[in-house]
């Protein structure tokens, strides 16, 4: 069974796991548009759809989103917009989708606390791909890989 894990958001990622093997991981595809004389990043829906279609995934797992303290309205709107794009693509491609709270997959996979914890755990589970989780900004990749691993274990 091939499972896609998605860390939703502009700094998120998409990972494909089959059994206990990480097949591939991609940063969330984005593009920049100008709005009110400011550059805004948005999810590139066409590229995301291509990646998901090519993955041949039989199911998808996404982290359940919730408001975070101190997060502004604009940030929450952007996150919701990204989630809508992801859910729309998965529905259009007829891929069964499950959302899971962060603590659920983190606890099931024994992920240490903090974003460094997910990078560390992903490198442990997928040592051949450890370099993809090496940088602090690779937390989206590690989260996506772990979410997919959680889904594959179900």
Residue positions per predicted region:
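Phosphate- and other anionic-substrate recognition elements at nucleic-acid/protein interfaces
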Residues: 1-154
């Amino acid at each position: 069974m091939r499972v896609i894990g998605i860390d939703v958001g502009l700094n998120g990622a998409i990972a494909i796991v089959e059994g206990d093997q990480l097949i591939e991981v991609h940063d969330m595809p984005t593009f920049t548009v100008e709005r009110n004389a400011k550059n805004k990043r948005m999810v590139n829906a066409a590229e995301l759809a291509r990646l998901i279609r090519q993955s041949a995934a039989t199911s998808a797992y996404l982290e359940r989103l919730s408001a975070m303290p101190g997060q502004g309205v604009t940030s929450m709107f952007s996150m919701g917009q990204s989630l809508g794009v992801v859910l729309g693509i998965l529905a259009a491609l007829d891929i069964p989708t499950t959302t899971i709270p962060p603590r659920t997959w983190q606890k099931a996979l024994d992920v240490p606390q903090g974003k460094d914890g997910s990078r560390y755990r992903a490198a442990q589970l997928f040592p051949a791909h450890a370099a993809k989780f090496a940088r602090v900004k690779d937390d989206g990749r590690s989260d996506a890989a772990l979410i997919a691993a959680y889904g594959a274990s179900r």
